[in-house]
């Protein structure tokens, strides 16, 4: 680009260096004849939209054209349509060599290859949880031919996460959808699947920071941050957020782009991370993402601790709540219950006398334990007599701490034929004895990997003591 010269007319708007990629994907790269002039390019490409400038790359010394040019449009959809219709065309009777047209790579991307069509056809949208794939298709089919739609769902419950993808057949159709759809969808260009950075991370960040750190984002185009915080004006931990509705879902915004792996590594510091997504906004060269936790307590803690966190050093990220349609009062009640349950479990576990108190009597024993979970549990069933032969033994691992014994008995008795639940003193593990193998298998299927009262359980078959005792003893 250093030796790109332009003889652009004085009547057109010439964007500055900082505006070359605003909006992103609005600049096309041309491979043309060395004899093709700017006026010919303007004649053939102006029907596609508002041309802001044309650059014909020339030799520094001879000033001859190198057969390469750039055309900057005002909108991404204009550039995409020009690429689709002009690639492989000839520009005149005296210019019989077909030209090549590509969407130019962003100057801040750190990559020297041109953008592929596949990267420009898939958009990411936020939708009501009631939306089906047909509803999504119906809303977005007006912008072009749709290859497929998908609604992201919870793998366990099958419930929509309020997120979806729409894939078009042409890049211009995806760009039209992003530019013209209702802003409530917060449509963004989705990250390519299995995208791999082509340059070392350090080089990538250094090049991006030179391009973006000195520029303030335009607040009205920053969809992931609340209107009060759109310009990263403050990162005070004591900001008043009384009007901000809490949820399990967070939006993350950064002046520096980030990958999904980097986003995960930051927010996985707080236990309970469910998933994270990275999105690309074609109008901004900034990092945008969505993070969701299994419980609201983790989300609240992550928002407080990570809002204003510097990653990479010198770049502060903005973290705010995203409305996921949940009832805030109900979420606060669940969070309070989880916190009390965790505090109670910690107190009981650190004091054996309290553990015995809860197990064998006391005022707490007369109350039915309250269980907070998304897991659908069967109703309570009677325990088997203590002298019943053990048919199956389960091993449980708790993270971050064990649940109280009364809660565990309430959970595991629901599968029937429960004999006993006991915890290993000083460890985050325990055992469950069943009088029937089917009941034990049902418990594993229902509870393994699930979160109850803020604690994740690993439930698996334990090694049988009888099998261990039958092993031949070593004689050496």
Curated annotation (Swiss-Prot):
Q: What does UniProt note about where in the body, tissue by tissue, this protein is expressed?
A: Expressed predominantly in fetal brain, in neurons but not glial cells. Mostly expressed in neuronal progenitor cells with reduced expression in differentiated cells. Less abundant in adult brain where expression is limited to cerebellum, olfactory bulb and hippocampus. Also found at lower levels in fetal and adult kidney, heart, lung and spleen.
Does the UniProt entry include the keyword Phosphoprotein? yes
Alphabetical list of SMART domains matching this protein? RRM
Q: Where would you find this protein in the cell?
A: Cytoplasm; Nucleus
Principal localisation: cytoplasm
Q: Which residues form the RRM domain?
A: 26-106, 121-192, 392-464
The protein's superkingdom reads Eukaryota
Q: Where is this cross-link: Glycyl lysine isopeptide (Lys-Gly) (interchain with G-Cter in SUMO2)?
A: 34
The biological process GO terms on file are: cell differentiation; nervous system development
Q: Which Gene3D superfamilies does UniProt cross-reference here?
A: 3.30.70.330
Gene Ontology CC terms, in alphabetical order: cytoplasm; nucleus; ribonucleoprotein complex
Region listing for Disordered, in residue ranges: 1-20
Q: Which UniProt keywords apply?
A: Cytoplasm, Developmental protein, Differentiation, Isopeptide bond, Neurogenesis, Nucleus, Phosphoprotein, Repeat, RNA-binding, Ubl conjugation
Keyword Ubl conjugation set for record: yes
Molecular function GO terms recorded: RNA binding
A Pfam family name for this chain?
RRM_1
Q: Which residues carry this modification: Phosphoserine?
A: 199, 464
Compositionally biased region (Gly residues)? 1-14
Functional description taken from the UniProt entry: RNA-binding protein with binding specificity for poly(C). May play an important role in neural development.
The identity of this protein, by name, is: RNA-binding protein 45
Lineage at the top is:
Eukaryota, Metazoa, Chordata, Craniata, Vertebrata
């Amino acid at each position: 680009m250093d030796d790109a010269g332009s003889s652009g007319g004085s009547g057109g708007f010439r964007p500055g260096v900082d505006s070359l990629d605003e909006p992103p994907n609005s600049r096309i790269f041309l491979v043309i004849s060395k004899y093709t002039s700017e006026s010919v390019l303007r004649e053939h490409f102006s029907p596609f939209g508002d041309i802001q400038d044309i650059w014909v790359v020339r030799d520094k010394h001879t000033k001859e054209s190198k057969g390469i040019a750039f055309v900057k449009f005002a909108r991404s959809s204009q550039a995409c349509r020009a690429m689709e219709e002009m690639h492989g065309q000839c520009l005149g009777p005296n210019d019989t060599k077909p030209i090549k047209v590509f969407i130019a790579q962003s100057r801040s991307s750190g990559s020297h290859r041109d953008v592929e069509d596949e990267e420009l056809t898939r958009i990411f949208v936020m939708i009501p949880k009631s939306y089906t794939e047909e509803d999504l298709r119906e809303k977005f089919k007006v912008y072009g031919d749709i290859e497929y739609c998908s609604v992201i769902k919870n793998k366990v419950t099958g419930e929509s996460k309020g997120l979806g993808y729409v894939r078009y057949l042409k890049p211009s159709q995806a760009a039209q959808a992003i530019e013209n759809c209702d802003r409530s969808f917060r449509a963004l260009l989705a990250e390519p699947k299995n995208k791999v950075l082509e340059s070392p991370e350090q080089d990538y960040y250094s090049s991006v920071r030179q391009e973006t750190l000195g520029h303030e984002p335009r607040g009205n185009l920053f969809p992931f941050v609340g209107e009060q915080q759109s310009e990263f004006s403050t990162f005070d931990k004591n900001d008043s957020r009384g009007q901000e509705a809490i949820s399990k879902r967070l939006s993350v915004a950064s002046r520096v782009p980030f990958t999904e792996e980097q986003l995960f590594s930051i927010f996985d510091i707080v236990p309970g991370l469910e998933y994270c997504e990275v999105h690309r906004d074609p109008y901004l060269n900034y990092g945008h993402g969505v993070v969701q936790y299994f419980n609201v307590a983790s989300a609240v803690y992550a928002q407080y601790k990570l809002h204003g966190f510097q990653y990479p050093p010198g770049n502060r990220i903005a973290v705010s709540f995203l409305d996921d349609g949940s009832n805030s009062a109900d979420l606060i009640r669940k969070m309070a219950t989880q916190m009390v349950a965790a505090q109670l479990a910690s107190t009981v576990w650190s004091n054996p006398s309290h553990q015995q108190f809860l197990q064998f009597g006391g005022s707490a024993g007369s109350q039915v334990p309250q269980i907070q979970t998304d897991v659908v549990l069967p109703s309570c069933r009677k325990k088997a007599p203590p002298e019943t032969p053990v048919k199956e033994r389960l091993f449980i691992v708790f993270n971050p701490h064990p649940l109280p014994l009364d809660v565990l008995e309430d959970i595991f008795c629901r599968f029937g034929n429960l004999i006993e639940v006991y915890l290993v003193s000083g460890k985050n593990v325990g055992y469950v004895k069943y009088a029937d193998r089917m009941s034990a298998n049902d418990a594993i299927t229902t509870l393994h990997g699930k979160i109850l009262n803020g604690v994740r359980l690993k439930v698996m078959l334990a090694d049988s003591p009888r099998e261990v005792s039958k092993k031949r003893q070593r004689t050496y």
